[in-house]
Design a protein with these regions (language model features):
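Transmembrane beta-barrel wall of Gram-negative outer-membrane proteins
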Residues: 44-67, 86-126, 146-170, 225-226
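Conserved C-terminal beta-signal and adjacent last beta-strands/turns
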Residues: 51, 104-106, 362, 458-551
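Structural signature of Gram-negative outer-membrane beta-barrels, strongest in the C-terminal barrel
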Residues: 212-214, 224-230, 236, 263-386, ...
């Protein structure tokens, strides 16, 4: 990665399709003259990068990869656990990996071609196998449960310079996100062991799949009209294939077999947008960025259209002070659903349809910034409203659902509101550098089908968020860095009391049975404990003949 930038407000017209933020990641292009590489080994993960020329001064490549090995480090402890009970074999599984690759090729004086690929996977689960044997009988049981999620994206880009003032990029992409869960239980019985006479077997498997696959094409133009106007314009097309969720159930017992799939109908949609924006240098003190983003979605015979104005300005005041302000309207056709009641990631992407309207937002922000020597200070406030947000209805879940409701029946749409302020201080040069950032914010949600229609704190509402980062070079070869983060605890719903209720006669094996029922609080009425973490690092550099070594 050569550069990462995040835009949380004041979105230029070239960005669209999301309400919250835009993360722009630029990959290294690879060295066209000589080979370089680096490798890092830490306590829980390793990574490596290599780059160099394919044809000197004409083409280059870059490859990088990383993987955690918590699963490998845990093996000795698991082996010791298994040795305590020879009939039990437990095998936990947790790791993630990702890989990046890029090829850069000069086609001529005015043309370049780029091909890049990324893929990553997180896997979490547990396998357990238990065996019982007494000489004449043998029984085996096994359990396998877990979840995994995978991402991949491939992009091909052609860059062409039409003139000293005009150049373009034509890009073709393919991306995919897949989320799986599994719960498998198997039992084998040999009552006349070692003979297989009378062998019994039973197997249950519950598998859940959700995903999204996109194919897209985009063209962008950058036009330096004159020293005061820099114009960007372009268009994009994306074909979405959504698999909102399919549950596959398998059950085998003796000669009885059941294999059925519930849900899984794909939803196809086409997204088209065009944009134009102008960076206008009005005078030496005032700079403005204005534009329009025109977005369209075609799905299930329905069409949605949105013309989104974007505006931003920066005005230099006396004394090195700068005032900035922005306004942006956004629309999002791809909706992220998160099951708030599960600690592990269960993010599901679902589309806007004829029944599910696209999410929209309006955001305004303003702030002041000042630079004093190596120091930079800023303060900014924002206010944002959101409509047609999506959430699970209370009690609804996509995982292993056996009812006849479609996934659309389990979604509620509502509104949201967020506002707050951010303080930031940074030292960018010198032997010691770093920054301090503090955010004070509020975030609310309101749905007719949730919390009795009353407004409540969003799950990720975080009143206070503080980050302190610093690094210093003691010498040319020894450096120290540290980062401390603090945040208000997550908003959660908890049971306030429990009570017994009677069950109807015939529902239980004895009449008069009772069930214990929890009475939950209002939605997100409680807070988890505040979260804080301190990371420190001490690095030693040793220069070798052909390479540098860090520890």
């Amino acid at each position: 990665i050569s550069n990462v930038s995040i835009t949380k407000g004041g979105f230029p017209a070239r960005y669209g399709g999301r309400l919250s933020s835009v993360l722009e990641v630029n990959m290294k292009e690879g060295n066209m003259k000589e080979f370089h590489g680096d490798a890092t080994v830490s306590l829980i993960a390793s990574k490596m990068t290599v780059e160099g020329p394919l044809i000197k001064d004409k083409s280059s490549f870059m490859l990088s990869a990383r993987r955690t090995y918590i699963d490998v480090l845990a093996k000795p402890f698991i082996t010791n656990l298994n040795n305590q009970d020879p009939n039990l074999n437990v095998s936990p599984r947790y790791y993630f990996y990702d890989m990046n690759g890029k090829v850069n090729y000069k086609l001529g004086q005015y043309d370049r071609f780029y091909l890049s690929h990324f893929q990553g996977k997180d896997d979490f689960g547990l396998r357990s196998r238990d065996t019982y044997e007494n000489g004449t009988e043998r029984y085996e049981s096994s359990i396998d449960f877990g979840l995994d999620w995978r991402n991949s994206i491939t992009a091909a880009r052609w860059n062409h310079q039409w003139s000293p003032k005009l150049f373009s990029n034509v890009t073709a992409t393919r991306s995919q996100y897949v989320f799986n869960t599994r719960a498998i239980s198997e039992e084998l019985g040999y009552p006349n062991y070692p003979d297989t006479l009378g062998m019994s077997d039973e197997r249950f498997a519950g598998l859940y799949f959700s995903g999204i696959e996109d194919y897209g094409a985009r063209i962008d133009f950058d036009f330096a009209l004159n020293p005061r106007h820099y114009i960007r314009y372009g268009a994009n097309y994306t074909n979405h294939t959504f698999s909102p969720g399919a549950t596959n159930l398998e059950f085998q017992s003796g000669g009885f077999n059941l294999d059925t799939t519930i849900g899984g109908d794909a939803v196809y949609s086409d997204e088209v947008y065009a944009f134009i924006e102008d960076e206008w240098k009005v005078n030496e003190n005032l700079k403005m960025n204005g534009g329009l983003h025109f977005a369209n979605l075609f799905v299930q015979g329905e069409s949605y259209h949105s013309l989104q104005p974007r505006f931003g300005m920066n005005y230099s005041l006396p004394g090195g002070l700068a005032f900035k302000a922005s306004y942006a309207e956004m629309m999002q056709f791809v909706n992220l659903l998160t099951n708030e009641g599960i600690g592990l990631p269960t993010d599901l992407w679902v589309p806007s349809t004829a029944n599910i309207k696209p999410q929209t937002s309006q955001q305004i922000a303003a702030g002041l910034a000042k630079s004093v020597g190596p120091y930079k200070f800023s303060v900014e406030g924002y206010y944002k409203t959101m409509d047609n947000l999506v959430s699970y209805k209370e009690g609804a879940s996509f995982l292993f659902s056996l009812d006849n409701d479609t996934w659309e029946d389990k979604i509620s749409q509502g509104s949201g509101e967020s506002y707050g302020m951010e303080l930031f201080a940074q030292r960018k040069s010198g032997r010691t550098t770093g920054w301090i950032g503090y955010t004070l914010s509020w975030s609310y949600r309101q749905f007719d089908d949730i919390n009795g229609g009353e407004r409540y704190f969003f799950t990720y509402d975080r009143r206070h968020d503080l980050s302190v980062v610093a690094s210093t070079d003691f010498t040319d070869n020894i450096s120290f860095s540290g980062a401390w983060v603090y945040g208000t605890g997550r908003a959660v719903t908890l049971p306030e009391y429990s009570y017994y209720t009677g069950l109807p006669d015939g529902l239980s094996w004895w009449d008069g049975a009772r069930a214990l029922v929890d009475r939950p609080s209002d939605k997100n009425a409680y807070r988890m404990s505040p979260y804080h973490r301190l990371d420190i690092s001490l690095s030693f550099k040793k220069e070798k003949k052909n390479y540098d070594r860090w520890w």
